[in-house]
């Protein structure tokens, strides 16, 4: 039973309150009914650990098995349909698995949009030194895409243009997705001093991506990349999804929202963990140094990225698939010595009491960066390459938000600083105060 009533008695005032419970949730503003002489009751939730910010039909979990469901379909069901990017994009973003005709129409729209390469975008990317990290180049390239079409900016148009306008939202998600692929292709060619490979209007999205990024176009590589897309396309309210939705709540264009999500994802506690993890592996150096590294982790002197997971408290259900894909591509320590180091860390940690007691196991991210390396991406491109999968979920959340009532994200904070400064320089601290909106 998930609906009911919460009965509350406030010991401060002896007042009693009733708050409705629906689907195991309560509405946060209902707590404002609970008052005292010092003010209304507020919820303190750093990091939004127990706060629901939106209703969604995109990604959920089977309550019995815990299997992730994408619009009600499991990854296995989607794999069995041999879904390509266009199929899964249509499912998550537009809400239904496409017919062959709908999939082809979307493929064509994406491919044609990918042939649009504004000169300002080329100049923005090429203005960077070839040794630059991809992140600032991506941000600059996407920003240049926005500048090439000022009509996409709501503020310039005089206000909201996307919220409630499904047709314009559909154009927006396609343009943002194509823009990301173009920018990545330009960055790759610029850094490697190679000619830019333009998109082919006759190819699928991932066929164009592999050509533009000069990835090995082998059958198993594309098969595993597409299967990886399904698992990696969305994982609910990740930090980058929350940031995207926070940005979207002020109703800007989708590329601006995408920029905010990408910037957030590059932090070492999110997708940046994969790049940070590969850097950590390189610093270990050799197999014989793995035991000492793990001891340093246990002493909190070093950080082990890719172990433990906020959602998956036991074995990460994605991990078996990641290992299967590495095997399908015959990717072994012979191709990448760091893989042997990772396997040794996994082996030793799995039998170490410290990690066992804390339920710290290798998650999919611990091995995923080897997948992207096998697919042909450079180590410092790992987070950026991940976005070729996750952009589906990000665009799905943006479009869904544009269909729902909008509340601009505006939290409050609890001020705990000085309140009164005495003339004799003594600081008097009163009780912490909830900030009124400035």
UniProtKB/Swiss-Prot annotation:
It comes from Talaromyces stipitatus (strain ATCC 10500 / CBS 375.48 / QM 6759 / NRRL 1006). The keyword Transferase applies. The active site is at residues 309, 365. Belongs to the citrate synthase family. PANTHER family: CITRATE SYNTHASE, CITRATE SYNTHASE, PEROXISOMAL. This is Alkylcitrate synthase tstJ. Its EC number is 2.3.3.-. Alkylcitrate synthase; part of the gene cluster that mediates the biosynthesis of the antihypercholesterolemic agents phomoidrides which are dimeric anhydrides. Within the pathway, the alkylcitrate synthase (ACS) tstJ and the alkylcitrate dehydratase (ACDH) tstI produce the decarboxylated monomeric anhydrides by coupling the C12-fatty acyl product from phiA with oxalacetic acid. The pathway begins with the highly reducing polyketide synthase tstA that catalyzes the formation of a C12-fatty acyl-ACP, starting from one acetate and 5 malonate units. Keywords: Transferase. GO terms for molecular function: citrate (Si)-synthase activity. Pathway: Secondary metabolite biosynthesis. Gene3D superfamilies: Citrate Synthase, domain 1, Cytochrome P450-Terp, domain 2.
């Amino acid at each position: 039973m998930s609906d009911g009533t919460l009965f509350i008695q406030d010991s401060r005032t002896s007042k009693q309150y009733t708050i409705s419970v629906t689907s195991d949730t309560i509405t946060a503003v209902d707590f404002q009914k609970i008052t005292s002489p010092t003010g209304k009751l507020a919820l303190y939730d750093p990091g939004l650990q127990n706060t629901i910010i939106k209703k969604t039909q995109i990604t959920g979990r089977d309550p019995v098995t815990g299997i992730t469901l994408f619009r009600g379909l499991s990854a296995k069901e989607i794999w069995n349909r041999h879904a390509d990017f266009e199929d899964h994009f249509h499912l998550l973003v537009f809400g239904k698995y496409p017919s062959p005709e709908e999939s082809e129409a979307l493929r064509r729209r994406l491919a044609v949009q990918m042939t649009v390469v504004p000169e300002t975008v080329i100049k923005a990317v090429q203005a960077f030194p070839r040794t630059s990290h991809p992140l600032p180049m991506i941000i600059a390239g996407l920003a240049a895409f926005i500048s090439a079409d000022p009509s996409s900016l709501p503020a310039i148009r005089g206000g909201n243009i996307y919220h409630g306008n499904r047709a314009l939202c559909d154009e927006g998600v396609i343009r943002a997705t194509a823009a990301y692929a173009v920018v990545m292709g330009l960055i790759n060619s610029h850094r490697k001093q190679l000619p830019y490979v333009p998109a082919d209007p006759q190819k699928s999205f991932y066929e164009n991506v592999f050509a533009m990024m000069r990835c090995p176009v082998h059958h198993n590589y594309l098969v595993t990349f597409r299967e990886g897309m399904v698992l990696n396309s969305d994982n609910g309210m990740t930090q980058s999804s929350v940031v995207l939705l926070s940005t979207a709540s002020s109703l800007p264009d989708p590329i601006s929202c995408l920029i905010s999500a990408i910037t957030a994802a590059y932090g070492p506690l999110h997708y940046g963990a994969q790049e940070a993890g590969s850097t950590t592996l390189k610093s270990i150096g050799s197999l014989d140094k793995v035991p000492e590294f793990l001891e340093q982790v246990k002493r909190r002197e070093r950080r082990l990225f890719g172990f433990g997971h906020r959602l998956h408290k036991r074995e990460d259900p994605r991990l078996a698939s990641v290992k299967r894909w590495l095997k399908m591509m015959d990717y072994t320590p012979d191709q990448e010595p760091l893989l042997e180091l990772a396997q040794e860390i996994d082996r030793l940690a799995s039998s170490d009491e410290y990690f066992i007691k804390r339920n710290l196991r290798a998650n999919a991210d611990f091995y995923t960066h080897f997948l992207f390396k096998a697919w042909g991406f450079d180590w410092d491109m790992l987070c950026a390459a991940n976005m070729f999968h996750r952009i589906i979920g990000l665009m799905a959340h943006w479009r869904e938000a544009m269909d729902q009532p909008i509340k601009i994200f505006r939290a409050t904070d609890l001020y705990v600083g000085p309140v009164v400064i005495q003339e004799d320089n003594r600081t008097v601290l009163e009780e912490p105060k909830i900030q009124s909106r400035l």
